[in-house]
Amino acid sequence: MHHVYVIECSDGTYYTGYTTDVQRRVAEHNAGDGAKYTRGRTPVTLRHTESFDSKSEAMRREYRIKQLSRAQKEALF
């Protein structure tokens, strides 16, 4: 399975990403091994996930979520 996730950083901002293992990826973010954006904003909290059968579907959804406003992202969860 392919997943898109939204995490909330310690400064209140949101980060959206793609992974095949959500729990591992969130742990990487919290360990400082995730995206550069989240490294100085730990701890992070998982707020939303969506699962897809194909990587291309997940990547399209990730892009769409990244285009949403903060309020629209919050409506997801």
Curated annotation (Swiss-Prot):
Domain GIY-YIG: 1-75
InterPro entries (UniProt xref): GIY-YIG_endonuc, GIY-YIG_endonuc_sf, UPF0213_domain
Ranges that cross the membrane: none
Pfam families per the UniProt record, alphabetical: GIY-YIG
Gene3D superfamilies on file: GIY-YIG endonuclease
Family of this protein: Belongs to the UPF0213 family.
Family annotation (PANTHER family): UPF0213 PROTEIN YHBQ
Protein name listed in UniProt: UPF0213 protein VNG_2274C
Lineage: Archaea, Methanobacteriati, Methanobacteriota, Stenosarchaea group, Halobacteria
